[in-house]
Every structure is written in structure tokens, then in C-alpha cells.
Amino acid sequence: MTTTTMAGTPVAPAAAKPWYKVLYVQVLIAIVLGAIVGWLWPTVATNDWIKALGDGFIKLIKMVIAPIIFCTVVSGIAHIQDAKKVGRIGVKALVYFEVVSTFALVIGLIIGNLVRPGAGFGNAAANEAAVATYAKQAAGQKSVDFVLHIIPDTVVGAFAQGEILQVLLFSVLFGFAIMSLGERGHTIRSFIDDAAHAVFGVISIVMRAAPIGAFGAMAYTIGKFGTGAILNLIGLIATFYVTAALFVFVVLGIIARLAGFSIFKFLAYIKDELLIVLGTSSSESALPSLMEKLERLGCSKSVVGLVVPTGYSFNLDGTNIYMTLATLFIAQALGFDLSFGQQLTILVVAMLTSKGASGITGAGFITLAATLAVVDPRLVPGMAIVLGIDKFMSECRALTNLCGNGVACVIVAWWEGELDRDKLNAGLSRQIDPTDMETAITTD
């Protein structure tokens, strides 16, 4: 196996870029500057144009998510000659998702019971109108509605509205259809492969705006909510961040070690995506570039195309930790002593409601409303307690979700025997520049 660029030339070790041209450095500086502007000049930071910088960047990313998923999934399936292989990858991915998601939920419950961050909490000023908005959205969420929602009314509508699961369903069916064509499908397979490279080219252009988007999003957040907004609830925030770190470095670290790679080197490899997510609070904003990097890291196109998009709805580890911790915190703050049976109910309910939480900012808060309503409707008003700091917790949710899905893809590829060890080692040892958008492909 040799590693080449799209032009067919060997990939040399990446030359070091000047520090100020490195994307993650630019994003990190932008986040710090945004926080300073939001703190010192909140009136300026909450201007609609500042907010538009962050919102605009997220919209640019979301603009290409549907075509990226379509091209990668269709291409991955269409190039597989064995239909059973697709099903095998899907089953392995779902098994992994459920096992690891359960670990995330259990860790959240254990830490919440040990630390009890909501114990002795004073009465919070309820923002009933804002809570009612989330509760109303959650009220209509039923399992049957979630299943039916996966099926689009029209294919065009699925793409136009950016519904990931709907696009994924159509892409899988379309990929199988091309597979069944055999040699007759060669032309359309080649066209979709070329289209995928073109869309990734769009991503490389859009990513240049990441520092601007991160600056706007962070400035607006600090300017609107202020540093004082988190002081009363710093215990919950700290508990959540520590729990998420424990999950990433211990649970995912052990899983990564079993597969033969270091979680620390992997996180260093995806540092650009982590910082983009930190600035935008949306794990979805890093989906296209994450898929590109995982292919360069040695995961096969078929595994990346199936596992990553599916994981954004079925493998939200950060959201799982958040829901168990936040539910316990609200119950403790309101003086409810949840029984062991009720806490088991949290596990079961959260396992279901989290499946509808996409990588969009704020989706975790809506699923929290759904979980509280099922566990005990009296807990729903307590959402007002965490409403003010949800924005500060959403960064950690999104970061953990991103880490979980990245590791999941590598693990499933390793489990399926579709992981190129040479490319994995080269990528994690930085012999291949992960920021180079000239896609490294594997040739026999």
C-alpha cells in the first residue's frame, strides 16, 4: 500500500507551517479575542452583526453536510460488491453505539450521585416562557414519530431541510441501487466520487472562515450571558466537564488502547475540529472535515460514510452524560429524592430520547425536556435552573460527541478489518499533515 495525493505523487512529510497560519491557532486566538470583547464590551458583542458571524459560519457548514453525507455514503456502498458487508458494518456500529452510550449514561448517574451538585441549591428565578418553548417541542416527541421522521416526504425536502437521518436513508438505498447495477453503474460511481472531492474542496474554502465564526459565536455568548451567569452554577458546570473528561480519557482511552492507538494522539490529530466545535457549540460544524480526516487516517470510505453520519444521531456520548447529570441536578435542586427505580428509568428514557438529538446547538436541552417529562413531570419546571448556563455546557456536550464519534469510526473500521494501520500510524505521528485538504488516498 502506498500513500499518494489525488495527483498521484507520493506524500512527503508535511513541512511546518508558520504558527500564525495554522488553523487551530487561528481559531484559539479568535475564541480568546471573542471572550475578551464579550466581557469588556457586551453591548458591542451582542450586536446582531457579531452574532451573525457565528451563525453564518454554522450555516456555511450545514450547507454542505447533506451533499457530503450523500456522496460519501453512496460512494462507500456502491464500491462494495458484497451487500452483506454493509449490513455487517451497520450492526457493528449500532452495537458499539449502544454499549458506549450506556457507559456514558451510567458514568453521569454515578458522578451525579457522588458529587450531588444540586444539593442545597437555592431557588432559581424561573424563565417560564423560555422553558415552555423547549417543553412544548419535547412534548410531541414519541418513538413512533422519530421512526417515521427518518422517512422523508420527498428526497428534495430531506436535502433542503438538512435532515441527516433522512438523507442517510436515501443515500443507503441509492448506494444499494448503484451496487445492483454492477458494471453499468461505473459511470455514476465515478461521477459521485468526483463530486465528493469537489464538495470537500468547498469545505476547504469554508474552513478558512472558521476563526471569524468562532470569534463571533464566543463574543456573543459572553456578551449576552456574562461571566456572572455561571457563578451560581459553577459546581454543575465543573462536574459536567470533569465527568466528560473522565469519559473521554478513561473510557474512550481504554477502548482506543484496545484497538492499538493513543487517545491523546487521536485528539491531537483532530484538534482543528475540536476548536471549531468549542467556538460554535455544534459538533455538526466539524462533521465534513472529520469525515475527511478519518479517511486520511486509514478508515475505509464505506465505514466512514456509514458510521459517522449515523453516530451523529445514535452516538451522542456528551448528550447522554449531560442528560443524566442535569436530571439528577434538577431533582436535587428541587428537593426530589429519586429512587433507584426512577434512576434506572432515566437510563432507559435517556437512551431513547438522545437518539433524536442531532449535533445542532441546543438540541440537548430539548431532549432534556423530553427525559424530565417521562421521569417525573414535576421536574420540567426545574429546567429554568440550568437554562441560563446551557450555552456554557453545550460546548462540552459537542466536544464529547465529536470525540465519541471519531473514536467510534476508527474502532468499527478496526473491528471490520477496514483500517489501514500504516496510514493510522503515519497520521497520528504527524507524518501526514491532517490540515492538508489534498486528500490522501490508498492505492493497491
UniProtKB/Swiss-Prot annotation:
Gene3D superfamilies: Sodium:dicarboxylate symporter. The keyword Acyltransferase does not apply. GO terms for cellular component: plasma membrane. GO terms for biological process: L-aspartate transmembrane transport. It holds the Pfam family SDF. GO terms for molecular function: fumarate transmembrane transporter activity; malate:proton symporter activity; succinate transmembrane transporter activity. The keyword Kinase does not apply. Its main location: membrane. It is a multi-pass membrane protein. It is found in: Cell inner membrane. Keywords: Cell inner membrane, Cell membrane, Membrane, Symport, Transmembrane, Transmembrane helix, Transport. InterPro entries: C4_dicarb_transport, Na-dicarboxylate_symporter, Na-dicarboxylate_symporter_CS, Na:dicarbo_symporter_sf. SUPFAM superfamilies: Proton glutamate symport protein (SSF118215). The chain crosses the membrane at residues 22-42, 60-80, 95-115, 162-182, 198-218, 236-256, 321-341, 346-366, 399-419. Belongs to the dicarboxylate/amino acid:cation symporter (DAACS) (TC 2.A.23) family. Responsible for the transport of dicarboxylates such as succinate, fumarate, and malate from the periplasm across the membrane. NCBIfam families: PRK01663.1. HAMAP family: C4_dicarb_transport. This is C4-dicarboxylate transport protein 3. The gene is dctA3.
